[in-house]
Protein backbone atom coordinates (compact mmCIF):
# COMPACT_ATOMS: atom_id res chain seq x y z
CA UNK A 1 0.00 0.00 0.00
CA UNK A 2 0.90 3.67 -0.34
CA UNK A 3 1.26 5.78 2.79
CA UNK A 4 -0.62 9.07 2.86
CA UNK A 5 2.62 10.91 3.56
CA UNK A 6 4.11 9.51 0.34
CA UNK A 7 1.04 10.60 -1.63
CA UNK A 8 1.19 14.09 -0.10
CA UNK A 9 4.90 14.39 -0.90
CA UNK A 10 4.40 13.23 -4.50
CA UNK A 11 1.56 15.71 -5.00
CA UNK A 12 3.57 18.60 -3.54
CA UNK A 13 6.62 17.85 -5.68
CA UNK A 14 4.47 17.80 -8.79
CA UNK A 15 2.51 20.97 -8.06
CA UNK A 16 -0.79 19.29 -7.18
CA UNK A 17 -2.76 20.88 -4.35
CA UNK A 18 -5.45 19.29 -2.17
CA UNK A 19 -3.29 16.69 -0.44
CA UNK A 20 -1.41 18.91 2.03
CA UNK A 21 -3.50 17.74 5.00
CA UNK A 22 -2.36 14.12 4.56
CA UNK A 23 1.20 14.68 5.72
CA UNK A 24 1.66 13.21 9.17
CA UNK A 25 -1.38 10.93 9.16
CA UNK A 26 -0.17 7.39 10.01
CA UNK A 27 -2.24 5.56 7.44
CA UNK A 28 -2.36 4.02 3.99
CA UNK A 29 -4.53 4.99 1.02
CA UNK A 30 -6.82 1.95 1.13
CA UNK A 31 -7.71 2.10 4.80
CA UNK A 32 -7.95 5.88 4.68
CA UNK A 33 -10.52 5.63 1.90
CA UNK A 34 -12.62 3.21 3.90
CA UNK A 35 -12.53 5.55 6.89
CA UNK A 36 -12.71 8.74 4.82
CA UNK A 37 -9.72 9.95 6.81
CA UNK A 38 -9.41 13.68 7.16
CA UNK A 39 -7.64 16.53 8.92
CA UNK A 40 -6.99 20.26 8.65
CA UNK A 41 -10.22 20.79 6.71
CA UNK A 42 -9.58 18.10 4.07
CA UNK A 43 -10.65 14.49 3.64
CA UNK A 44 -10.24 11.56 1.25
CA UNK A 45 -13.63 12.03 -0.40
CA UNK A 46 -12.75 15.59 -1.45
CA UNK A 47 -9.87 14.39 -3.67
CA UNK A 48 -11.15 10.92 -4.59
CA UNK A 49 -11.97 10.19 -8.25
CA UNK A 50 -12.23 6.43 -8.78
CA UNK A 51 -11.03 3.07 -7.52
CA UNK A 52 -10.79 -0.65 -8.17
CA UNK A 53 -11.71 -2.79 -5.17
CA UNK A 54 -11.97 -6.45 -4.22
CA UNK A 55 -15.46 -7.40 -3.06
CA UNK A 56 -16.59 -10.15 -0.68
CA UNK A 57 -16.97 -12.58 -3.60
CA UNK A 58 -13.35 -12.10 -4.66
CA UNK A 59 -14.26 -10.07 -7.75
CA UNK A 60 -12.62 -6.81 -8.82
CA UNK A 61 -15.16 -3.99 -9.00
CA UNK A 62 -14.72 -0.49 -10.41
CA UNK A 63 -16.03 2.51 -8.49
CA UNK A 64 -16.51 6.03 -9.86
CA UNK A 65 -17.27 8.83 -7.44
CA UNK A 66 -20.30 10.22 -9.27
CA UNK A 67 -21.99 6.79 -9.13
CA UNK A 68 -21.24 6.07 -5.48
CA UNK A 69 -23.19 6.73 -2.31
CA UNK A 70 -22.08 10.02 -0.68
CA UNK A 71 -19.39 9.86 1.96
CA UNK A 72 -20.15 10.50 5.60
CA UNK A 73 -17.93 11.56 8.48
CA UNK A 74 -15.23 8.89 8.71
CA UNK A 75 -16.93 6.53 6.27
CA UNK A 76 -17.21 5.99 2.53
CA UNK A 77 -20.09 3.46 2.53
CA UNK A 78 -19.12 1.70 -0.71
CA UNK A 79 -15.73 0.78 0.74
CA UNK A 80 -17.08 -0.60 4.02
CA UNK A 81 -17.08 -4.13 2.59
CA UNK A 82 -14.88 -3.66 -0.47
CA UNK A 83 -11.08 -3.70 -0.20
CA UNK A 84 -9.52 -0.87 -2.24
CA UNK A 85 -6.68 -2.18 -4.43
CA UNK A 86 -6.10 0.86 -6.64
CA UNK A 87 -7.29 4.46 -6.50
CA UNK A 88 -7.18 7.62 -8.59
CA UNK A 89 -7.35 11.11 -7.15
CA UNK A 90 -7.95 14.61 -8.51
CA UNK A 91 -6.11 17.68 -7.25
CA UNK A 92 -5.71 21.32 -8.20
CA UNK A 93 -2.65 22.70 -10.02
CA UNK A 94 -0.50 24.96 -7.88
CA UNK A 95 2.99 26.23 -7.18
CA UNK A 96 5.12 23.41 -5.68
CA UNK A 97 6.83 25.76 -3.22
CA UNK A 98 3.53 27.14 -1.93
CA UNK A 99 2.08 23.64 -1.63
CA UNK A 100 5.17 22.47 0.26
CA UNK A 101 4.88 25.46 2.60
CA UNK A 102 1.26 24.60 3.41
CA UNK A 103 2.21 20.96 3.91
CA UNK A 104 4.93 21.92 6.36
CA UNK A 105 2.58 24.29 8.20
CA UNK A 106 0.04 21.48 8.61
CA UNK A 107 2.80 19.19 9.85
CA UNK A 108 3.94 21.71 12.45
CA UNK A 109 0.36 22.36 13.57
CA UNK A 110 -0.15 18.63 14.02
CA UNK A 111 3.06 18.30 16.02
CA UNK A 112 2.00 21.15 18.27
CA UNK A 113 -1.49 19.79 18.94
CA UNK A 114 -1.22 15.99 18.69
CA UNK A 115 0.96 13.41 20.48
CA UNK A 116 3.98 12.02 18.65
CA UNK A 117 3.90 8.63 20.37
CA UNK A 118 2.41 5.73 18.35
CA UNK A 119 -1.39 5.84 18.19
CA UNK A 120 -4.30 5.06 15.90
CA UNK A 121 -5.32 8.71 15.74
CA UNK A 122 -8.50 9.99 17.37
CA UNK A 123 -10.13 7.21 19.38
CA UNK A 124 -13.72 8.48 19.55
CA UNK A 125 -16.13 10.28 17.25
CA UNK A 126 -17.01 13.70 18.65
CA UNK A 127 -20.49 13.49 20.22
CA UNK A 128 -23.00 16.27 19.57
CA UNK A 129 -22.75 17.59 23.12
CA UNK A 130 -19.00 18.17 23.41
CA UNK A 131 -15.73 17.30 21.61
CA UNK A 132 -14.55 13.88 22.78
CA UNK A 133 -11.12 15.14 23.82
CA UNK A 134 -12.62 17.92 25.95
CA UNK A 135 -15.03 15.47 27.57
CA UNK A 136 -12.28 13.00 28.45
CA UNK A 137 -10.16 15.84 29.81
CA UNK A 138 -13.05 17.05 31.98
CA UNK A 139 -13.45 13.50 33.30
CA UNK A 140 -9.89 13.80 34.59
CA UNK A 141 -8.57 10.98 32.42
CA UNK A 142 -5.61 12.67 30.72
CA UNK A 143 -2.61 10.48 31.48
CA UNK A 144 -4.75 7.58 32.71
CA UNK A 145 -2.94 4.34 31.91
CA UNK A 146 -3.80 0.67 31.61
CA UNK A 147 -0.80 -1.54 30.95
CA UNK A 148 1.22 0.30 28.33
CA UNK A 149 -1.74 2.16 26.80
CA UNK A 150 -2.30 5.72 27.95
CA UNK A 151 -4.77 8.55 27.42
CA UNK A 152 -2.43 11.14 25.94
CA UNK A 153 -1.64 14.00 28.32
CA UNK A 154 -1.41 16.21 25.22
CA UNK A 155 -4.75 15.38 23.55
CA UNK A 156 -7.24 13.25 25.47
CA UNK A 157 -8.89 11.76 22.37
CA UNK A 158 -5.67 9.92 21.56
CA UNK A 159 -4.66 6.64 23.17
CA UNK A 160 -0.90 6.28 22.84
CA UNK A 161 1.40 3.28 23.04
CA UNK A 162 4.04 3.75 25.74
CA UNK A 163 5.91 0.71 24.44
CA UNK A 164 4.66 -2.79 23.60
CA UNK A 165 1.06 -2.08 24.59
CA UNK A 166 -1.27 -5.03 24.09
CA UNK A 167 -4.57 -4.86 22.24
CA UNK A 168 -6.29 -5.68 25.53
CA UNK A 169 -4.61 -2.66 27.16
CA UNK A 170 -6.18 -0.43 24.53
CA UNK A 171 -9.64 -2.02 24.53
CA UNK A 172 -9.80 -2.01 28.33
CA UNK A 173 -8.86 1.66 28.33
CA UNK A 174 -11.56 2.37 25.75
CA UNK A 175 -14.07 0.49 27.92
CA UNK A 176 -13.09 2.51 30.98
CA UNK A 177 -13.36 5.85 29.19
CA UNK A 178 -16.76 4.95 27.74
CA UNK A 179 -18.08 3.80 31.11
CA UNK A 180 -16.93 7.01 32.82
CA UNK A 181 -18.49 9.16 30.09
CA UNK A 182 -21.80 7.31 30.41
CA UNK A 183 -21.87 7.24 34.20
CA UNK A 184 -20.78 10.81 34.87
CA UNK A 185 -22.12 12.71 31.86
CA UNK A 186 -24.74 10.43 30.32
CA UNK A 187 -22.86 10.50 27.00
CA UNK A 188 -22.31 7.41 24.85
CA UNK A 189 -18.94 7.54 23.10
CA UNK A 190 -18.64 5.81 19.74
CA UNK A 191 -15.21 4.65 18.61
CA UNK A 192 -13.73 6.22 15.51
CA UNK A 193 -11.00 3.57 15.32
CA UNK A 194 -11.99 0.20 13.87
CA UNK A 195 -11.44 -2.69 16.27
CA UNK A 196 -10.72 -6.02 14.57
CA UNK A 197 -10.83 -9.35 16.38
CA UNK A 198 -12.88 -11.15 18.99
CA UNK A 199 -14.53 -7.98 20.30
CA UNK A 200 -15.06 -6.02 17.09
CA UNK A 201 -18.86 -6.27 17.36
CA UNK A 202 -18.72 -4.38 20.67
CA UNK A 203 -17.16 -1.24 19.22
Predicted regions span which residues?
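Anion-binding (especially nucleotide phosphate/pyrophosphate-binding) glycine-rich loop
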Residues: 1-29
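Gly/Ser/Thr-rich helix-start
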Residues: 2, 25-32, 39, 122, ...
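N-terminal short leaders/motifs
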Residues: 2-9, 37-38, 73-79
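Core subunits and conserved enzymes of cellular information-processing
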Residues: 7, 23, 30-41, 82
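A glycine- and small-aliphatic-rich helix-loop capping segment at beta-alpha/alpha-beta transitions
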Residues: 10-16, 35-46
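Short glycine- and Lys/Arg-enriched binding-loop motifs that mark or flank ligand-binding interfaces
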Residues: 20-27, 34-37, 117, 143, ...
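Short polybasic amphipathic segments
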Residues: 49-53
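Phosphate/pyrophosphate- and phosphate-bearing ligand-binding catalytic cores of soluble enzymes
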Residues: 54-175, 179-203
Amino acid sequence: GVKLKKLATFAAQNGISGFEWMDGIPGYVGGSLRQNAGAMGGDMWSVFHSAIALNDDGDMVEFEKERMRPARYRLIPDFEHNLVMQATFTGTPGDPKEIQTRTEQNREQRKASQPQLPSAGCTFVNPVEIPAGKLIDELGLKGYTIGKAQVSPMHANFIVNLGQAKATDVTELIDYIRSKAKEERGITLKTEVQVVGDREAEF
